Design a protein with these regions (language model features):
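A short, Lys/Arg-rich alpha-helix, primarily the initiator
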Residues: 59-83
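Recognition helix of helix-turn-helix/homeodomain-like DNA-binding domains
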Residues: 97-113, 121
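Short alpha-helical "recognition helix" segments of helix-turn-helix
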Residues: 81, 90-94, 103
Length: 169
């Protein structure tokens, strides 16, 4: 961990870098927390930003955490996987044999994602996602255990930024 000061890009004030926990809202998910990450913080304006050494690895780890979760996919998680795969709404909808309107309703939470569509989204992400297939083989066997009763139970994904491991809480 570096302990130096520099200027804030927002207000020009001095910033400090400290190791800590950071809610990774930039992912598009309110449920992701990075643990053990260096955070640049400006006391003057309150701006905070994480220092992420391996962004590709972090994004892959997050996709893996979503795909292997035993909880039904949420709309924001579907959006994250689509963007992780680099697909437009039209492309992803065609891949899932649905229309863009239905996909949009899933992503915004206006309509629940059915269990078969949930499994298809995970399978597509595993097939097309960089490096996901090999890492998730064991989890695929547990897909039939997805707990639809827990669909509305809030959960959080904690990602260790240094080891790129994750846990659900």
């Amino acid at each position: 961990m570096q302990n130096f000061k520099t200027s804030c890009i927002e207000c020009g004030g001095e910033v400090a870098i400290k190791k800590g926990t950071y809610r990774f809202r930039e992912s598009g998910l309110d449920t992701v927390v990075l643990k053990g990450v260096e955070i640049v913080r400006c006391p003057a304006c309150g701006d905070e930003s994480p220092i992420i050494a391996n962004l590709d690895g972090l994004l892959r780890t997050l996709a893996l955490a979503i795909v292997t979760s035993k909880l039904p996919l949420t709309g924001p998680e579907v959006r994250y996987l689509r963007k992780y795969l680099g697909m437009s709404g039209d492309q992803f909808a065609r891949m899932l044999h649905t229309d863009k309107s239905t996909l949009s309703k899933w992503e915004t939470g206006a309509v629940n994602i059915g269990s078969k569509s949930d499994l298809l989204i995970r399978a597509v992400a595993l097939h097309l996602g960089r490096g996901l297939r090999d890492e998730a083989e064991e989890a695929v066997r547990g897909f039939e255990l997805i707990d639809e009763e827990s669909a509305n139970v809030p959960h959080r994904i904690e990602v260790d930024a240094a080891t790129l491991t994750f846990a659900y809480s």
